[in-house]
Swiss-Prot record:
It comes from Blochmanniella pennsylvanica (strain BPEN). This is Fe/S biogenesis protein NfuA. Binds 1 [4Fe-4S] cluster per subunit. The cluster is presumably bound at the interface of two monomers. Involved in iron-sulfur cluster biogenesis. Binds a 4Fe-4S cluster, can transfer this cluster to apoproteins, and thereby intervenes in the maturation of Fe/S proteins. Could also act as a scaffold/chaperone for damaged Fe/S proteins. Belongs to the NfuA family. GO terms for molecular function: 4 iron, 4 sulfur cluster binding; iron ion binding. [4Fe-4S] cluster binds at C154, C157. Homodimer. It holds the Pfam family Fe-S_biosyn. Its cofactor is [4Fe-4S] cluster.
Length: 196
C-alpha cells in the first residue's frame, strides 16, 4: 500500500532513535478525497496506537494508518531528498484526491470522541511536534468538555494554557460547536523537556 524508499527508511530510523521507545510512524491525509488533500507523516507513540489502525511493517519500524485513510494512500510513495544543507521528505499519493464516498461518510459519522481525537492527531499534533510535544484526548465528559493531556515538550511549557485556549479549544469549538470547552489534566512539571 505505501512504499518507503530505502533512504527514507534510514531517515525515519534515525529520527525514531531519539523518541520514546516503541514510537512508530503515522501516515495520514488531511482533507482526503478533495483537491486540497495533503498527506502528512508524524511520530506515533504507543499510547496513540488505535484498534482501527492498519499496520505496515518495515525492517526497523512500522507505519500506522487509520483504516479510513487506506484507500487514499493506495500506491503512495515516501522518499527523502538529502543535500548538504537539509533533507526534504516527499510524499506522492495519487489516490489522495480521489473521492471515496463511503469512507468520507464514515469519517463524518464517527463518534464525537473519535472525530476530536482525529483533529488532535492530524491537525494539532503535527504543529506541537515541532516543539517536541503532543496532546491526546483522554475522554469527553457528560458536560461535553474535552479532557486532554500534554506530553513531551508541551508538559510544563509556560505557553500551555495559551495553546489550550487560543489553539486547541478554538479549533475544536469551531469544528464541533456542541463542545463546551477543553480541560487540561496534565500534571505540568517544568523541566529540561519543556519547550518554553
Amino acid at each position: 500500500m505505501i512504499y518507503i524508499t530505502p533512504i527514507a527508511q534510514k531517515h525515519f530510523t534515525k529520527l525514531l532513535a531519539g523518541k520514546k521507545p516503541g514510537t512508530q510512524i503515522r501516515v495520514f491525509v488531511v482533507n482526503p478525497g478533495t483537491v486540497h488533500a495533503k498527506c502528512n507523516v508524524c511520530f506515533c507513540p504507543p499510547e496513540e496506537f488505535k484498534t482501527s489502525d492498519v499496520v505496515i511493517e518495515f525492517d526497523l519500524f512500522s507505519v500506522h494508518v487509520d483504516s479510513v485513510y487506506v484507500s487514499f494512500l493506495k500506491d503512495a510513495k515516501i522518499d527523502v531528498m538529502i543535500n548538504e544543507l537539509d533533507s526534504q521528505l516527499t510524499i506522492k499519493a495519487p489516490n489522495a484526491t480521489k473521492e471515496c464516498n463511503n469512507t468520507r461518510n464514515n469519517m463524518n459519522n464517527d463518534l464525537l470522541e473519535d472525530r476530536v481525537r482525529n483533529v488532535l492527531q492530524f491537525q494539532i499534533n503535527p504543529q506541537l511536534e515541532l516543539h517536541g510535544g503532543s496532546v491526546s484526548l483522554i475522554r469527553i465528559t457528560e458536560d461535553l468538555l474535552a479532557v486532554i493531556k500534554f506530553y513531551g515538550g508541551c508538559n510544563g511549557c509556560a505557553m500551555a494554557s495559551y495553546t489550550i485556549k487560543e489553539g486547541i479549544e478554538t479549533t475544536l469549538k469551531n469544528l464541533f460547536p456542541e463542545l463546551k470547552g477543553v480541560l487540561d489534566m496534565t500534571q505540568h512539571q517544568h523541566g529540561t523537556h519543556s519547550f518554553y
